[in-house]
């Protein structure tokens, strides 16, 4: 543990006592001691982080964010602080115009520092196949001959990213449906759609490997470009009747193998889910499938996040007991399925063409907290 200036052992003793109070839930006492430590040595980044965690557990979110910011000023290359501040801003921050921008900047710096040295993912066959195809694409498109961290152009565009032509119809359907499940076609403008595709093709952000056959990109992996921040802004402007005061709280993207399975039955920890697909239609060899199945039953109260996200068999058993009915929305490029996040859903069976740019890609944006 870092020694704090002052009497020998004083800092270490205070930090140990503060940590013990925190672990025991004595948050007021922990806060007092961490502030004492920072009075002795204000440049101790770890103490600012610990104070931030105490403040968050007390429900003092903005003060917690300020403490994380102070820690980052002291240690701007600390990946743990970058991750924590990025997450706090995205998941818990208020309706500040710069919240997403600051969060994404933290995540991008985290990704560059964490993955900049290169290194590939797991050795699962579908991962190896994907990485080989992506490296070929990077060589052809950017002249890259070896595997290393790379982000394609993800800057904002001059045009509006979201096509608002269907907004009125979609909002009316949303307000009249029970359960709330709607489809919005032509979600993004053509320029935004094409640029988002190229960002997903050209960025080595696909860091999580799932045995079913798909890969995941998260904000902390680099799925945090200014274009996505612009899409969020334009989405909230186009669909206030659906999103209301709900803010973007998390996002991810999935990239699939051409024939293997997709995401199993689960629900999302948010209020409104925007799930949209960006791969071109001619890549889909089974146009009546490849989309999303959504059930008309929501997660019961008292279920933990791990139960409704990580337990496909348990979710299916619950749906069977509830006599749930499902609808399957076929895949279409630039189609969004928008639904109440607590509804169970899963990826439909799929069959896409082989080839790197034919891989099915979907983005999920989660709004609000529940």
Where are these regions (language model features)?
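Register position in tetratricopeptide repeats
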Residues: 23-24, 57-58, 91
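Fe(II)/2-oxoglutarate oxygenase catalytic core
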Residues: 91-336, 342-370
């Amino acid at each position: 543990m870092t020694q704090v200036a002052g009497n020998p052992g004083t800092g270490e003793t205070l930090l140990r006592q503060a940590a013990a109070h925190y672990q025991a839930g004595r948050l007021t006492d922990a806060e007092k001691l961490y502030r004492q430590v920072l009075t002795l040595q204000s440049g101790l980044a770890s103490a600012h982080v610990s104070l931030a965690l105490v403040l968050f557990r007390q429900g003092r979110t903005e003060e917690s964010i300020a403490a994380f910011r102070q820690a980052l000023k002291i240690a701007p290359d600390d990946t743990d602080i970058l991750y924590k501040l990025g997450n706090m801003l995205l998941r818990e921050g208020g309706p500040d115009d710069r919240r997403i921008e600051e969060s994404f900047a933290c995540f991008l710096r985290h990704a560059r520092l964490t993955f900049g040295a290169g290194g590939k993912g797991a050795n699962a066959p579908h991962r190896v196949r994907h990485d080989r195809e992506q490296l070929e694409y990077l060589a052809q498109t950017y002249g890259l001959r070896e595997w290393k961290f790379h982000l394609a152009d993800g800057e904002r565009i001059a045009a509006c990213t979201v096509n608002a032509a269907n907004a009125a119809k979609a909002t009316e359907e949303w307000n009249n449906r029970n359960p709330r499940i709607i489809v919005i076609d032509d979600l993004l403008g053509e320029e935004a759609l094409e640029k988002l595709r190229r960002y997903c093709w050209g960025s080595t952000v696909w860091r999580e490997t799932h045995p079913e056959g798909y890969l995941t990109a998260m904000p902390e992996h680099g799925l945090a470009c200014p274009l996505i921040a612009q899409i969020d802004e334009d989405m909230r402007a186009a669909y206030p009747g659906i999103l209301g005061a709900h803010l973007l709280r998390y996002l991810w993207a999935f990239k699939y193998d051409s024939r293997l399975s997709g995401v199993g039955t689960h629900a999302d920890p948010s209020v409104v889910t925007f799930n949209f697909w960006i791969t071109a239609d001619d890549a889909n060899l089974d146009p009546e499938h490849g989309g999303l199945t959504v059930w008309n039953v929501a997660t019961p109260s008292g279920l933990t996040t791990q139960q409704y996200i990580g337990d496909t068999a348990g979710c299916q058993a619950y749906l069977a007991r509830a006599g749930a009915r499902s609808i399957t929305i076929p895949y279409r490029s630039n189609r969004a399925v928008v639904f109440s996040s607590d509804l169970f859903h899963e990826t439909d069976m799929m069959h896409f063409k082989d080839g790197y740019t034919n891989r099915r890609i979907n983005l999920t944006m989660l709004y609000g907290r529940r």
